[in-house]
């Protein structure tokens, strides 16, 4: 029994040494010359590397690379598995960028086991020129009705009076970054930009940089990256109509706003007001049917607004509210009486007025009496003679 136990321990030790030795032999190096490059496209960066130095017995193996990257203040990494030697993506250049990469050996080269190299890392950041107080404030961009983009900002808190700002933009399809050609101004200072005719710019990262100039100090640049379809503010719905069916059902209709947005891309929010009560509803259609809360209500109105739905964008901006549309009510006996009474009063007044006019046109009774008296006197005198 003792001999069997010794043999078992020896066998286990031999297998462990064999496995360990085999694992130690399968190594792969990390990629070489990993770096993050800025081609001047306002945040669209290149992460590139060169293949690792590969041992002779792995030269026929296909290598894969596991790439992780993020802005330095982010809690999560974005992970990509690729066989290419370059990867491109957009970043927020207001913050630093960091990335790391390692090599993967395919399983058929390692007898089914996973083998990765150590990580190699790289980072990138824009040198901060100018104090934080010189950077623009409250930058906002809205893509109105999917037709034109308006960005606005306020000057930095500590800038001098000679400071002015310029805006550049880029998206995939442009050869290089372009400067705004239509600035919004206040006291001859640029406080915004309007961009039209942004062909083929939807569903792509849209990059913006606003920098400034002053003779007295450097101005810190500000960066933004977004996708246009996520900041669309449509026009409000038009041609509202409301009716009541069967004294209970409220039927509301409206037309989609004019412009290039497909009707299937809208979602709507409706506010119904019945006397002193109001409530909200939502729909993706341009009509809705609801039940009345009070059958005797005299005041029944609604208004509606819209934005891009989740099928066409990840986010959106609500339009302004439409004009309020109210129900005109029944045209039954009660409403007829309300209409007929003032009409009758009007005609009575008109008839009285005509009678007064006709009465003024008749001969005066005094004149007629005077003529008759003269005739009587004349007849009486003839008899005496």
UniProtKB/Swiss-Prot annotation:
Membrane topology reported for the UniProt record: Single-pass type I membrane protein
Keywords: Cell membrane, Disulfide bond, Glycoprotein, Membrane, Receptor, Repeat, Signal, Transmembrane, Transmembrane helix
Cystines in this chain: 61-109, 141-151, 180-193, 265-312
Domain Fibronectin type-III: from-to ranges: 30-130, 133-221, 236-334
Post-translational modification: Cleaved by MMP8 leading to a soluble form that is also able to interact with IL13.
MF (Gene Ontology): cytokine binding; cytokine receptor activity
Record-stated family: Belongs to the type I cytokine receptor family. Type 5 subfamily.
Protein name: Interleukin-13 receptor subunit alpha-2
Source organism per UniProt: Rattus norvegicus (Rat)
């Amino acid at each position: 029994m003792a001999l069997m136990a010794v043999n078992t321990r020896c066998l286990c030790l031999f297998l462990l040494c064999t496995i360990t030795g085999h694992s130690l032999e399968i190594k792969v190096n990390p990629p070489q010359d990993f770096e993050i490059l800025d081609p001047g496209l306002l945040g669209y960066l290149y992460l590139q590397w060169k293949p690792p130095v590969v041992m002779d017995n792995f030269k026929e193996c296909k290598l894969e690379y596991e790439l992780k990257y993020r802005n330095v203040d982010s809690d999560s990494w974005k992970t990509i598995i690729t066989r290419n030697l370059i990867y491109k993506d957009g970043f927020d250049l207001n913050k630093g960028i960091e990335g790391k990469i390692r090599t993967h050996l395919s399983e058929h080269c390692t007898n089914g086991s996973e083998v990765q190299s150590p990580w190699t890392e790289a980072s990138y950041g824009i040198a901060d020129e100018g104090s934080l107080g010189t950077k623009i404030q409250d930058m906002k961009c809205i893509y109105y009705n999917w037709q034109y983009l308006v960005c606005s900002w306020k000057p930095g808190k500590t800038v001098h009076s000679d400071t002015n700002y310029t805006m550049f933009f880029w998206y995939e399809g442009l050869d290089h970054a372009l400067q705004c050609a239509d600035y919004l101004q206040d006291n001859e200072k640029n406080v915004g930009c309007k961009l039209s005719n942004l062909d083929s710019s939807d569903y792509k990262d849209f990059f913006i940089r606003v920098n400034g100039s002053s003779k007295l100090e450097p101005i810190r640049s500000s960066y933004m990256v977004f996708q246009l379809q996520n900041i669309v503010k449509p026009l409000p719905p038009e041609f509202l109509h409301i009716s009541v069916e069967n004294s209970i059902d409220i039927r509301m209709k409206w037309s989609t706003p004019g412009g290039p947005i497909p009707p299937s891309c809208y979602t709507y929010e409706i506010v119904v007001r019945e006397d002193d009560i109001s409530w909200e509803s939502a729909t993706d259609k341009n009509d809705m049917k609801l039940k009345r809360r009070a059958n005797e209500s005299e005041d029944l109105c609604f208004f509606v607004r819209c934005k891009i739905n989740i099928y066409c964008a990840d986010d959106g901006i609500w339009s302004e509210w439409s004009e309020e549309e109210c129900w005109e009510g029944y045209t039954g006996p009660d409403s007829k009486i309300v209409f007929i009474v003032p009409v009758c009063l009007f005609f009575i007044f008109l008839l009285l007025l005509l009678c007064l006019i006709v009465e003024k046109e008749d001969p005066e009774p005094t004149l007629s009496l005077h003529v008759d008296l003269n005739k009587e006197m004349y007849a009486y005198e003839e008899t005496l003679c």
